[in-house]
UniProtKB/Swiss-Prot annotation:
Pathway: Nitrogen metabolism; (S)-allantoin degradation; (S)-ureidoglycolate from allantoate (aminidohydrolase route): step 1/1. The keyword Hydrolase applies. Signal peptide: none annotated. Its EC number is 3.5.3.4. InterPro entries: Allantoicase, Allantoicase_dom, Galactose-bd-like_sf. Keywords: Hydrolase, Purine metabolism. One of its GO terms (biological process) is allantoin catabolic process. The keyword Hydrolase applies. The gene is alc. Belongs to the allantoicase family. One of its GO terms (molecular function) is allantoicase activity. It is an enzyme of class 3 (hydrolase). This is Probable allantoicase.
Length: 330
């Protein structure tokens, strides 16, 4: 029996926003390989056709009339360990592959070649049409590329590769300031009160948000209380500066925010939600403004090394990015 896995607590290493790219496919006659890893969920366009037939939101090969099978190679945006996979056949009904498997390799200095050694990380699995196929993995190796094999042909809407980025913290000096929460540094959004309009993981992404959808936004709160999100830092460290970016949030930014933090030892990711109610105050409540980058330094309390933070927003609304600058601890 496969272990249970909360996929939302991991990073999609195959996200184009992190630099991932579908670099090769044996055939993508009906639907371009680049669509296999699009950030957005797959969609159906009823009356859209192109020169090769029905437009499909995913990767689709032509009907195979010879021996063999099709595959697509994806360069991950961030090298890392892979905890789970989602092979998504949304809207592929009469044209999905009967089965698929996934291989991975470590090729940090360039693209894989004919001599590259691939390792099977998911054996051949039966697929259903218009379905998500979630598979938890137990593998601690670091990979840079994955290869989706489909037997013998057909279409897959999306491939999600959930894992943890591999960060060489030895290359970061003890006196070098770094964003401890950034996804590229291993930061992960673990839990939140609500993410009706935008996913919690967006606040740790690179750069500024592209639009309002590229942030974390909650539904309008109609009951007492406030919304919150919990973040695991990529490395324990001392936080000295907080940056809250409300880019594109103009009529729906939070009135204010505060941050709690703790050095969590032991337990699981799922247990921190209850613990977070009692964490110490890293930053007392601060007013926020629309479509603005706000930096807080003097307002940040010295808590020493911490591993997790809880961002509280009052009462609800949207945040584009959260940056937690500090120094790694030994």
């Amino acid at each position: 029996m496969e272990k249970a896995l909360n996929f939302e607590q991991y990073v999609n290493l195959a996200d184009p926003k992190l630099g991932a790219e579908a670099i090769f496919a044996t055939d993508d006659f009906f639907a371009d390989k680049s669509r296999l890893i699009r950030t957005e969920a797959a969609e159906w366009k009823e009356d859209l056709y192109d020169d090769n037939g029905k437009w499909m939101d995913g990767w689709e090969s032509r009907r195979k009339r010879s021996e063999g099978y099709d595959f697509c190679v994806v360069r991950l945006g961030l090298a890392g360990t892979i905890a789970g996979l989602d092979i998504d056949t949304s809207f592929f009904t009469g044209n999905f592959p009967p089965s698929a498997s996934v291989d991975a390799c470590y090729s940090p200095d360039g693209e894989p070649s004919d001599s590259t050694e691939w390792q099977e990380i998911l054996s051949s699995q039966s697929l259903q049409g218009d379905s998500h196929h979630l598979h938890a993995l137990d593998n601690e190796q670091v990979f840079t590329h994955v290869r989706l094999n489909i037997y013998p042909d057909g279409g897959v809407a999306r491939l999600r590769v959930y894992g943890r980025p591999s960060v060489n913290w030895d290359q970061i000096g003890i006196d070098q300031e770094v964003d401890l929460a950034a996804v590229v540094n291993g930061g992960r959004a673990l839990a939140c009160s609500d993410e009706h309009f935008g996913k919690k993981s967006n606040i740790l992404g690179p750069g500024r948000g592209e639009n309002m959808g590229d942030g974390w936004e909650t539904a309008r709160r109609r009951t007492p209380g406030n919304d919150w999100v919990i973040v695991a830092l990529g490395r324990p460290g001392k936080i000295g500066k907080v940056v809250v970016d409300t880019a594109h949030f103009k009529g729906n930014f939070p009135d204010s925010c505060s941050i709690q933090a703790a050095y969590v030892q032991g337990g699981t990711d799922d247990q921190v939600e209850t613990q977070s109610l009692f964490w110490r105050e890293l930053m007392p409540s601060q007013k926020l403004s629309a479509h603005n980058i706000q930096e807080f330094v003097e307002q940040v309390n010295d808590l020493g090394a911490v591993t997790h933070v809880r961002l509280n927003i009052f009462p609800d609304g949207g945040i584009s990015r959260l940056r937690l600058f500090g120094f790694k601890s030994e």
